[in-house]
Design a protein with these regions (language model features):
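Surface-exposed, active-site-proximal loop segments in enzymatic domains
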Residues: 65-70, 97-109, 122-134, 227-235, ...
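Active-site mouth loops of central-metabolism enzymes
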Residues: 26-38, 91-100, 128-135
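Histidine-acidic metal/acid-base catalytic patches
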Residues: 4-5, 17-27, 32, 38-48, ...
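Acidic (Asp/Glu)-rich catalytic clusters
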Residues: 20-23, 44-49, 68-88, 102-115, ...
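Active-site beta-loop-alpha junctions enriched in small/polar residues
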Residues: 31-35, 58-62, 93-96, 123-125, ...
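Active-site acidic/histidine proton-transfer and metal-coordination neighborhood
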Residues: 3-11, 44, 96-186, 286
Length: 306
């Protein structure tokens, strides 16, 4: 058991039912990658107008906050978010284990500034080791974070990602999470990637993963066929083929309570809009963010989650 003096993860992994009722169950947090190249003022202002509840801040190489500058820059972003009534309870990292450069300082600083959940870095299957070896290595690395996470009161989440990534088929991640058996290590269940990998079987994977889900990633896509080759095209929520109704229905039926991270990976600006003034660009971005936020809110209401 984790000592009572340590904060508990804010997903359903450790929440009591009484605690859940007090908190906002499904905060909508924006994965800040599309805004990383802009300044903090612009990012915060855009997200406030976009209607999100908070930030899923990139704290990683080439991110909004660089790991080596986390002690300087993360408190600044946290203060700016607070002044604008935005949560900063989530971040995206490149941390795969205790030995990742700056890992301990990033997690300590994040926890000190109110972040409760972080997405971990990835492991990949490769040609020079067998799949079982990759899974065993992932387990060892993930286990190395258990004590650090518990010490600082911050929960790690591993995102399932399409391709040759550990976690893509979900069963491999489930095996590791069951063996690790820590509330401080969770799944960031990504419906987009679950659907693209398991077109007709994703619901089975979600049901099995439900007790381990610490956060929910939402985005949409469709298929494009060019010269006989299928390629993913990322689109606004509701304009693709991802079974988002099934996803939100499952959240209700499986009693999953976790923060939502909204991933906008289709272009916030088209090429012909890149030369517009910053104000005009912001108007376009805000409108797109608002549309996706409203879509999520409509589904949360439809399935009586809020």
């Amino acid at each position: 058991m984790v000592a009572t003096t340590v904060a508990t993860p804010f997903s359903n992994l450790l929440f009591s039912s009484e605690k859940i009722e007090v908190e906002k169950k499904y905060t909508i947090n924006f994965f800040t990658k599309p805004l990383d190249k802009y300044g903090y003022d612009f990012m915060i202002d855009t997200l406030k107008m976009g209607g999100v509840d908070g930030l899923d801040l990139t704290v990683r190489p080439k991110g909004s906050v660089l790991p080596e500058k986390v002690a300087e820059d993360l408190p600044l972003v946290a203060e700016m978010a607070k002044k604008n009534d935005l949560f900063l309870e989530m971040m995206v990292s490149n941390i795969t284990g205790a030995e990742t450069p700056h890992a301990k300082n990033v997690l300590k600083t994040a926890a000190q500034n109110g972040i409760k959940h972080y997405r971990m870095g990835y492991f990949r299957y490769n040609d020079y080791e067998k799949a079982k070896e990759t899974i065993a290595n992932a387990k060892t690395q993930i286990q190395s974070l258990m004590g650090i996470n518990a010490q600082y009161g911050i929960q790690g989440g591993y995102q399932n990602h399409t391709g040759n990534y550990f976690g893509a088929p979900l069963w491999d991640l489930m095996v590791v999470l069951e063996k690790v058996a820590s509330p401080w290590i969770s799944s960031q269940f990504d419906i987009y990637h679950a659907y693209s990998e398991g077109y007709r079987s994703w619901q089975v994977s979600m049901e099995m993963m439900a007790p381990k889900i610490g956060s929910l990633a939402v985005k949409d896509f469709t298929w494009e066929i060019n010269n006989g080759q299928a390629k993913i095209k990322k689109v606004p929520l509701g304009q693709g083929i991802v079974d988002l109704d099934g996803f939100f229905k499952n959240i209700k039926n499986l009693n999953i309570v976790a923060p939502i991270t909204l991933h906008i990976e289709y272009p916030l600006l088209e090429k012909h809009e890149e030369n517009l003034s910053l104000i005009e660009k912001q108007k376009i971005m805000v409108a797109k963010i608002q549309n996706d936020v409203q879509f999520i809110l409509s589904k949360l209401h439809q399935y009586q989650l809020i």
